[in-house]
Amino acid sequence: MGRSPSSDETGLKKGPWLPEEDDKLINYIHKHGHSSWSALPKLAGLNRCGKSCRLRWTNYLRPDIKRGKFSAEEEETILNLHAVLGNKWSMIASHLPGRTDNEIKNFWNTHLKKKLIQMGFDPMTHQPRTDDIFSSLSQLMSLSNLRGLVDLQQQFPMEDQALLNLQTEMAKLQLFQYLLQPSPAPMSINNINPNILNLLIKENSVTSNIDLGFLSSHLQDFNNNNLPSLKTLDDNHFSQNTSPIWLHEPPSLNQTMLPTHDPCAQSVDGFGSNQASSSHDQEVAVTDSVDWPDHHLFDDSMFPDISYQS
């Protein structure tokens, strides 16, 4: 809240000074000086307050006022004094002959303050701004990461990456072709590229569904020239039957085509025995004509509790 005007200041003129008012003030000060600014307006014949006369003389009318652009030496002096004194413009102006405090303040706000900010300094402390340092640091880190990605892309182009993926998939197919298709001619495991197995193990996406024991047993069959047929692999592996009798002694055609005998099909009370007698005789005939490997069958781990009965 501003100071209320006194009775002596009531009706005084305010606003811009006229040239006639400037001449009266200059002539009076040249003749009498400015010992008392409160009594000067009445003595000089001015309808102004003492403060207005003082500011007009100090900032505009005194003969030693230096006009024009600030020099480089004056700018350096203002910066050094502001770092020590702060915004004490009157004390700064006392070290610059011919410059007023108001002129120095305006020059600071319009030029020097903006210049310090652009240079990365705090205009109040004259120290480097930490926020600019952190912002520039994040930009430098982003540029560094981008440079690393560019270098990596130059070392491994996209075409080479696509070619490597294609070679991996073809290696998988080649290995399955060796495992699943029958081979009448002798084949050595040395003919298989070892990179195929390495690529398949690294991928994990396909090898996770393959039994490693099953894979190793069939790789040994390559050297023994005992490669099983595709149907044998389907019947044994995908049905989870890995009995040694089926791996070392492939079944004959008669054994694979042999119909199974379901005990549940027999009648409990003898009902329907005549109707099933003809089909039963045929099954007995087929069974008698087939040489079953009983000594191997009951030795298998699938029949631990069944004893052979003649």
From Swiss-Prot:
GO terms for molecular function: DNA-binding transcription factor activity; transcription cis-regulatory region binding. The gene is MYB53. Probable transcription factor. The keyword Ion transport does not apply. Highly expressed in roots and at lower levels in leaves, stems and flowers. Induction: Induced by abscisic acid (ABA) and gravity in roots. Residues 37-61, 89-112 bind DNA. The keyword Plastid does not apply. Its main location: nucleus. This is Transcription factor MYB53. InterPro entries: Homeodomain-like_sf (IPR009057), Myb_dom (IPR017930), Myb_TF_plants (IPR015495), SANT/Myb (IPR001005). It is found in: Nucleus. PROSITE patterns: HTH_MYB (PS51294). Pfam families: Myb_DNA-binding. Signal peptide: none annotated. Residues 9-61, 62-116 form the HTH myb-type domain. Keywords: DNA-binding, Nucleus, Repeat, Transcription, Transcription regulation. One of its GO terms (cellular component) is nucleus. It comes from the Eukaryota. Interacts with FBX5.
